[in-house]
Each structure stands twice: as C-alpha cells, then as structure tokens.
From Swiss-Prot:
Location of N6-acetyllysine modifications: K55, K594, K601
Lineage: Eukaryota, Metazoa, Chordata, Craniata, Vertebrata
InterPro entries, A to Z: ERG24_DHCR-like, Lamin-B_rcpt_of_tudor, Sterol_reductase_CS, Tudor
Gene that encodes the chain: LBR
Species of origin: Homo sapiens (Human)
Intervals, Nuclear compartment: 1-211
Modified-residue entries (Phosphothreonine), positions: T58, T118, T200
Listed name of the protein: Delta(14)-sterol reductase LBR
Phosphoserine: modified positions: S59, S67, S71, S86, S97, S99, S128
Localization per Swiss-Prot or TrEMBL: Nucleus inner membrane; Endoplasmic reticulum membrane; Cytoplasm; Nucleus
EC number: 1.3.1.70
GO MF annotation, one: DNA binding
Length: 615
C-alpha cells in the first residue's frame, strides 16, 4: 500500500471540485483504503480529495513574481494606457512591444475566463453525481468523492497558480469582471482547446452486494428462493426435514390468463396514479439543480382500490382464484419484472448523464441490477416512484384479504381466525401508514440514490406482495389458535413498535421541513459542513436508526400469531433483520462521506446503531 504524502494538520492547497482552482486547506485525516484525504477549507467546508489534487504551499510560493502581484484593476489600467500612449514616446526597457502587449491581453483574458469559472459554494445533496451545471469539458475536475472513471483535462500550472489568488468566497474588494470582446474570447477558447490532456486513472467504484458476481447470484437466486418458500408453505408438513418440496412442471406454473389479470391490476393502479387528485410536491435537488414534481395520491389510490374490491365481492367475483393460482401469479409478476427491467436498462442507454444514478458503475450486469437511470419517466409518469408504493404495497393488502377469505372457505369457518385477523390488521395499518405519509418516501435511499433496475423492480412488484403476505398464506394451510391473553401481548408489542417507528419518522420529517419549529426547540443537534444539522436527542439520540428498530418490532408482532410449530412464518423477521442491518451499513457509509467529522461526533454521542446496548 503506498505511503501517504501529507500529514494530519498540515496546511496545503487543495483543488476545489469542478474547477482548476486551488485553495488553502488543512489535512484532517487520510483513508488508507480509498487513498483519499479529508480536508477542511477556510469556510469550514470538508471534502475528500485525491493526493494528486493536493499540492504543498511551497510549490505556489516559488512561482510568485511581480507580474502576478498587481491588482486586476491596475492591470486593466496599464492595458488601457498602452493603447493610448503616443507612438513617438521612447519605450523603456520594461515596457512591452505591441506583440507582447497582445500576448498579455490574451493572458489577461484567459485569467478573466478562469475567474468566471470560480465555483459557487453549493450544498451537497444525496443524488449528486460528478459535475456542476454547465461545467465546460476542458476544465479539470476533482471528482474523487464520487469515484467516477472519466477523462480529466489539465490546464497549465501557471493558470492554476493565478487562480489561487481568488478566495473561496467573493469579497467586496474583489475586482468586477469585465467583458472580453468576441475576438479575444475565440482566441482564448481556441488556445485552451489545443492543450493536451491526460487520462488520470481513478480507483474503481466500490460495488455493493458483492459486486458483479453477487448481483448475478441475487438475480437468479431470489426468484428460485421465492418459489421454494411458497412450495414449502403449501406442504402439509413444512418443516425443514421435508426440504426440498416437490417441484411442479414449468408449464403448470404459466397461465396466460393469470398474466392478463396481473397486467390488468397494474394498469388499474397506473390509472389511479394519473388521476389529478392529491397535492403536488417537489423532490430533492438533482445534479443539475432541478426538482422533480410528484403527485401524492397513494392513499386515494388505496381508497379507490378498496371500492373496486368491495364492489367485486358484492358482485360475486371469486377471489379464491388468486389463492388457487398463487404460484402462477408469482411467476407472472416475476416475468413482468424482468421485462420491465430490460426496458429500463435499454432506455437508460440514451439517458443524459445528469439523469443517471450515482450508484451506477458502468458494468452492464451490475447496472441492470442496481438501476442505471435515477428517475425514469414517461412524460410526468415516474416509473420508480409509482412502483414503490402502488402495485406491490396495495397488492400486499389485497393478497392478505384473499388469504383471509381462503382460510374461511378451506377451514369451513364462519369468521376468520383471531391469528388471521391480527396479521391482516397489523399489516393493513402498516400499509395505510406508508400511503398516508407518502411524502417521506422522497427522501429515502431508494429515491435519491438507487437507480430503477431489477433490484427495486423485483422488490416492489414481486418480493413485497408475495413474501410480506407470507404469514397470511401460511395460516390458510396451518391454522393456529391464539388465546386472548397472548393476543393482547402481541397487540401491545405491535403498538410499541409502531409508536417508535412513527414517532422517529415524524420527528425526522418535521425537523427537515422546519428546523426552527418551536415544538422542536428541545432537541439537540450537531451542525455539519453541509449547512444541515443532525439530531442527537429525542428518538434519534436513542439509537441511530430508531425507525428500523420500530420496523423490526412490528415485523416480530405479525409473525407471532402463526405460533411456534415451524420456522417458516419467521422467515420474514429473519430476512428483514438482515435487510435493515445491510441498509444501515449503506446509510452509515453515505452519511460518513457526506457529513465527515460531524457524523463521527454523532456516532460518539449515539453509539448504538439499531438495537440499544446490542448493536
């Protein structure tokens, strides 16, 4: 491993991302794995820079000269006087010839062009990729924090040094920029264009989920695992001793009629999404500064879906068909997901760079899985946002209702079992809460960081409706009688989880909307270099992810009504724990990168991640 060049606390000059300008910075730390330095600018901004974007102060001081020390206004004055000077006056040795004067004018013009490119101090945001809006292709950029492999163009050291005379923030005494006539602009642009460039090798982006081999196994393994779980659950004895279950022929799993019903369901939800009801809000800023608009009508879609389902039941529609063809519906959803993922990847190949996800890598297999385009839209129809809460989440509730009716029919019950009522009620509350607080989805990692590919498509359209309804599906074939005292304890556990989950999310969302709200004045915070504050009290001073803790408690509560005869009903809580621990690790990585020292202070104040005194 190469040794570091600069020590902690050393004062050097670092390149500002998106420009060729160097400013005085202090070395805070060095990551030996990524070979990146965390530096602090004079205004408090903390960034990660590569070693070749940092230079010692001595390399600049050696280039000092009289010509660079004069003020811009005086340079402009001397330039003006050189044109009006009498031709008969004998020039002094220090005076310039006409040719030298012209070259100096060009140099001055180039300097002024560089000043115009002085970067603004922008607040970073989660879905930033690598470029500022309107940045020229020929200016060298420092994109180390984003780790994107790209060609980088290099200006001369002289231009870089001149740029260091301008501070990070504009001051009153700084000279106003003056216009450059079109002839000089063309000359400068031409001269800059012919400069040679060098390709700087950048360390490959860290890939999640085990990289390309990992996502390849996930894409093929998850559908297989899903069908094995459903087949195991349908067995009379679903114990692990009877694994693997008997496998049906492939032709038995495919029915065109089932696929048609699934398409009809999807299109109905599209229709509800497009209805002009519900308020319109803006999402988080994109790389180019745009804020996409989203219509919040998920709860209205749920009400309309309930009306359609109720009317269908009243008209005598047989919903037992869904239960008897449950595996076929799972296969239809999987096929639809694969087709959608192929479409998403193909359209992303033509998407502008600013529309790509920061999680994309350039590898076709990995990008097909993680999603290459951040917010794929057809007009105003946002595919990712729609799939996150509509077909799968509302479909989960419909499947639970189907299982409740199937239990009554198969077990010849006049009313559903208490266990089935608990499972349906708990999960109905969870879905309604998500739809009612739909706006909170816009700040999640799924929306602001991950692209829309196979991972989210399969998770939203297949995994959620067919795995999250697993407890209800299990109770149809494996009834479990729950006593009222036991039911009371389970209800209390569920309510505790919901209070933690909703309280933490509501506190976070309220603080994001209005940090100066008097109702939140009692909360303690840590200020960050991005201008935002981190909550270190309330729910977020208890553990770093109290919403995850509440989520897991609720997941346990809706598994307990299934009893303890088999481990299958507890697959969800096991899987969900692994999912949230992994997601917490992803959150930790991105927050540490974004907030730097402030995040480390927060971790010291709040040492436990999800489970207090455990993890």
């Amino acid at each position: 491993m190469p040794s570091r060049k600069f020590a902690d606390g050393e004062v050097v000059r670092g390149r500002w991302p998106g420009s060729s300008l160097y400013y005085e910075v202090e070395i805070l730390s060095h990551d030996s794995t990524s070979q990146l330095y965390t530096v602090k600018y004079k205004d408090g901004t903390e960034l990660e820079l590569k070693e070749n974007d940092i230079k010692p102060l001595t390399s600049f001081r050696q280039r000092k000269g009289g010509s660079t020390s004069s003020s811009p206004s005086r340079r402009r004055g001397s330039r003006s006087r050189s044109r009006s000077r009498s031709p008969g006056r004998p020039p002094k040795s220090a005076r310039r010839s006409a040719s030298a004067s012209h070259q100096a004018d060009i140099k001055e013009a180039r300097r002024e062009v560089e000043v115009k490119l002085t970067p603004l101090i922008l607040k970073p945001f989660g879905n930033s990729i690598s470029r500022y809006n309107g940045e020229p292709e020929h200016i060298e950029r420092n994109d180390a924090p984003h780790k994107n492999t790209q060609e980088k163009f290099s200006l001369s050291q002289e231009s870089s040094y001149i740029a260091t005379q301008y501070s990070l923030r504009p001051r009153r005494e700084e000279v106003k920029l003056k216009e450059i006539d079109s002839k000089e602009e063309k000359y400068v642009a031409k001269e800059l264009a012919v400069r040679t460039f060098e390709v700087t090798p950048i360390r490959a982006k860290d890939l999640e989920f085990g990289g390309v081999p990992g996502v390849f196994l996930i894409m093929f393994g998850l559908p297989v695992f899903l069908f094995l779980l459903l087949l195991m659950c349908k067995q009379k004895d679903p114990s692990l001793l009877n694994f693997p279950p008997p496998l049906p022929a492939l032709y038995e799993l495919w029915e065109t009629r089932v696929f048609g019903v699934y398409l009809l369901w999807f299109l109905i939800q599209v229709l509800f999404y497009l209805l002009p009801i519900g308020k319109v809000v803006e999402g988080t800023p994109l790389i180019d500064g745009r804020r996409l608009k989203y219509r919040l009508n998920g709860f209205y879609a749920f009400i309309l879906t309930s009306a359609v389902i109720g009317t269908s039941l009243f008209q005598g529609v047989e919903f037992h068909y869904v239960y008897s063809h449950f595996l076929q519906f799972a296969l239809a959803a999987t096929v639809f997901c694969v087709v959608l993922s192929v479409y998403l990847y193909m359209r992303s190949l033509k998407a502008p760079r600013n529309d790509l996800s920061p999680a994309s890598s350039g590898n076709a297999v990995y990008d097909f899985f993680i999603g290459r385009e951040l917010n794929p839209r057809i007009g105003t129809f946002d595919l990712k946002y729609f799939c996150e809460l509509r077909p799968g989440l509302i479909g989960w509730v419909v499947i639970n209702l189907v299982m409740l009716l199937a239990e009554m029919k198969i077990q010849d019950r006049a009313v559903p079992s208490l266990a089935m009522i608990l499972v349906n009620s708990f999960q109905l509350l969870y879905v309604v809460d998500a739809l009612w607080n739909e706006e909170a989805l816009l700040t999640t990692m799924d929306i602001i960081h991950d692209g829309f590919g196979f991972m989210l498509a399969f998770g939203d359209l297949v995994w959620v409706p067919f795995i999250y309804s697993f407890q209800a599906f299990y109770l149809v074939s494996h009834p479990n009688e729950v006593s009222w005292p036991m039911a009371s304890l389970i209800i209390v556990l569920k309510l505790c989880g919901y209070v933690i989950f909703r309280g933490a999310n509501s506190q976070k969302n309220a603080f994001r909307k209005n940090p100066s709200d008097p109702k939140l004045a009692h909360l303690k915070t840590i200020h960050t270099s991005t201008g935002k504050n981190l909550l270190v009290s309330g729910w977020w001073g208890f553990v770093r992810h109290p919403n995850y803790l509440g989520d897991l408690i609720m997941a346990l509560a809706w598994s307990l009504p299934c009893g303890f005869n088999h481990i299958l009903p507890y697959f969800y809580i096991i899987y969900f724990t692994m999912l949230l621990v992994h997601r917490e690790a992803r959150d930790e990585y991105h927050c540490k990168k974004k907030y730097g020292v402030a995040w480390e202070k927060y971790c010291q104040r709040v040492p436990y991640r999800i489970f207090p005194y455990i993890y």
